[in-house]
Regions:
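Amphipathic alpha-helical scaffolding segments comprising HEAT/armadillo-like alpha-solenoid repeats
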Residues: 21-34, 57-68, 94-107, 131-146, ...
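Short inter-helical turns and helix N-cap capping residues of alpha-solenoid HEAT/ARM repeat scaffolds
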Residues: 37-39, 73-75, 111-113, 149-150, ...
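Residue-level detector of extended alpha-helical repeat arrays and alpha-solenoid scaffolds
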Residues: 11, 42, 78, 116, ...
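Alpha-solenoid helical repeat scaffolds
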Residues: 54-55, 90-91, 128-129, 171
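Structural signature of alpha-helical solenoid repeat scaffolds
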Residues: 50-51, 86, 124-125, 159-166
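Hydrophobic, well-structured mid-protein blocks that either form specific transmembrane helices
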Residues: 72-121
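Non-membrane alpha-helical segments in proteins
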Residues: 40-52, 65, 79-87
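N-terminal alpha-helical scaffold/docking segments in eukaryotic complex subunits
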Residues: 1-52, 165-170, 178-203
Length: 203
């Protein structure tokens, strides 16, 4: 059984390797630590599960735990939920993602801009793992009303959206996506550096 002091003694650089040697029986303890009020403990547990999910499918059985977090009153928990769902979409042979997508989409309207950003980035990972959902994901991203977003966050959020749409456009040909990207690049929210960044993705 993994001990808390052992968990917290792992350096950030060692986390990817540490995640490889976690036993399946220790995972339930680490998943429970996601609800810790202590930020450091919670974040360490999250990173271990995130790295573990990149290589093994034994975090996937906790999918419903992560889905419940999407509706948590705490924004950190909502972010943890969607990010771990995104990492485990690659293992989703039971097609749970289809049933969870609407809950994930709700976070695009989250009160916390950082949660909105993490949700958009997570949807990018989901789109990569689940190409059949690309059209729905793209549609929801394009429906985000930038006017309702805090002005200081508009550029960052629009860049996140365009990064995902640029990736989706590689496999999903859509006039709507092309038009949205074009209008966004000429809409005045992005600076020259950001525009160049997106243009490079479209090559």
């Amino acid at each position: 059984m993994i001990k808390l002091e052992n968990l917290m003694s792992i350096d950030k650089e060692q986390l990817p390797e540490a995640a490889k040697v976690i036993s399946s029986s220790e995972l339930s303890t680490i998943v429970k630590l996601l609800s810790e009020k202590n930020d450091k403990i919670r974040y360490q547990a999250f990173l271990l599960l995130q790295y573990r999910s990149l290589q093994f499918n034994d975090v996937y059985p906790y999918w419903e735990n992560f889905r419940l977090k999407l509706r948590d009153s705490n924004s950190y928990q909502r972010s943890i939920g969607i990010m771990l769902i995104a990492e485990n979409a690659r293992w989703d042979l039971e097609n749970k993602m289809e049933a969870s997508l609407d809950d994930c989409m709700e976070l695009l309207k989250d009160e916390k801009p950082i949660t909105v950003r993490q949700s958009i980035q997570s949807l990018g990972k989901i789109a990569e793992a689940k190409p059949n959902l690309n059209e729905k994901i793209a549609s929801m991203l394009m429906s985000i009303d930038m006017v309702e977003i805090k002005e200081t966050m508009r550029k960052s959020i629009l860049l996140d959206i365009l990064n995902v749409l640029a990736a989706i456009s590689k496999s999903l040909k859509s006039d709507k996506i092309d038009s949205f990207i074009f209008n966004s690049l000429s809409g005045g929210i992005l600076d020259k550096k950001a525009i160049k960044q997106i243009e490079m993705l479209l090559i």
